[in-house]
Structures are given as structure tokens and as C-alpha cells.
């Protein structure tokens, strides 16, 4: 009897973080205004599915916040929309080059911004441009989004994703490799 009781307590404690997690509906759409023109790139380009290397629930944004779908899918969508916004015509097969992404970490902090308590979400995503059987270019994008705490985790995630896109499309070396 004691063994059952102990196992039940361990089971409940082990799944308690999942029960207290807050689910966030993420309806991300890139609405930024980067001025990078990808319409004249000379190679066919594909974005591979983003991999999540954090080793936790794939829907985890950070701390106790879960998205309705895996964070890797949300980041994929952000990269796709950001490149399309610049006129890139992305392909699904027979590509000359592909972009591979890997989520390294996500961290949520509460910070003071000029007397305003704010949420700061940082998502680190390693991105590599592959072509001709090798890595041509790679970097780690630091998507840091900071918003007043009242705006919530959804707004912090949107700001973080916008920053991921800006860092990618404004990287001179990335742009050079696509020409």
C-alpha cells in the first residue's frame, strides 16, 4: 500500500509542471518592414524543418508557457515569411541551397526597462546555409523580444520572432552567399 502511495505522489509531482503550464495561442505573421530584396537571388532556396535541440516539450516557449504547436514550426513559419517578404521564391524540392535551423535555447526573464516591468524572451536559433554538399554559412540568431509585462508572452514571442527574421535577412554574409 505504501508503495502505491509513494508511486502516486511521485507521478503527481512529476507531471505537476505540465498541469500548471499556460497554453498560448500563437498566430504569428511577419509584419516587419525589412528592405532586403531576395527576388533576384540566383539559386533555388529551401527552408528545412527547424529542429528543436532543447530536449523539452516541443511546444515549450519558455518557463511554463506552451504554444499550441511546436516552437520549431513557429520559427520555421517566421523564417519562411521573412524571406518571402523580401521576394524570395522558396522551393520544396530540387534546391541549390537550403537553410537548416536548430533551436538551441529559449529563456524568459522579467526585466526593468526605464521603470517598466517587462518580459524579455530570448530564443537562440542556430541557422546554417547548406549547398554543394557543405555548410556555406552559419550563425546563431538571437531573437530577443522585450515587451511590457501587461502585453504578455504572446507579444514577447512576436517581438522575438521579428528579431530572428531581421537578424537573418540583414546578415551581409548570408546575403552574399545567396548571390
Task: List each model region and its residues.
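Short secondary-structure boundary motifs at beta->alpha junctions and helix caps
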Residues: 58-71, 130-178
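Bacterial N-terminal signal peptides that target proteins for export
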Residues: 1-7
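A structural "domain/chain start" motif
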Residues: 16-73, 173-179
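A short, polar/charged loop/turn motif at coil->beta-strand junctions and beta-hairpin connectors
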Residues: 7, 39-41, 95
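Sec/Tat-exported extracytoplasmic proteins
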Residues: 75, 79-87, 107-110, 168, ...
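Bacterial N-terminal signal peptides
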Residues: 8-16
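Surface-exposed short loop/turn segments
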Residues: 22-28, 86-136, 142-151
Amino acid at each position: 500500500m505504501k508503495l502505491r502511495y509513494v508511486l502516486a505522489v511521485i507521478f503527481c509531482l512529476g507531471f505537476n509542471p505540465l498541469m500548471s503550464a499556460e497554453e498560448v495561442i500563437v498566430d504569428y505573421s511577419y509584419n516587419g518592414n525589412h528592405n532586403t530584396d531576395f527576388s533576384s537571388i540566383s539559386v533555388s532556396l529551401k527552408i528545412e524543418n527547424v529542429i528543436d535541440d532543447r530536449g523539452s516539450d516541443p511546444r515549450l516557449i519558455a518557463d511554463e508557457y506552451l504554444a499550441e504547436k511546436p516552437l520549431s514550426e513557429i520559427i520555421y513559419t517566421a523564417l519562411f515569411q521573412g524571406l518571402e517578404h523580401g521576394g524570395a521564391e522558396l522551393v520544396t524540392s530540387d534546391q541549390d541551397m537550403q537553410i537548416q535551423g536548430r533551436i538551441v535555447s529559449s529563456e524568459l526573464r522579467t526585466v526593468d526597462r526605464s521603470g517598466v516591468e517587462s518580459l524579455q524572451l530570448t530564443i537562440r536559433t542556430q541557422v546554417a546555409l547548406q549547398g554543394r554538399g557543405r555548410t556555406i554559412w552559419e550563425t546563431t540568431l538571437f531573437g530577443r523580444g522585450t515587451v511590457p509585462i501587461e502585453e504578455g508572452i504572446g507579444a514577447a514571442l512576436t517581438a522575438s520572432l521579428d528579431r530572428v527574421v531581421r537578424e537573418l535577412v540583414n546578415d551581409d554574409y548570408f546575403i552574399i552567399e545567396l548571390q
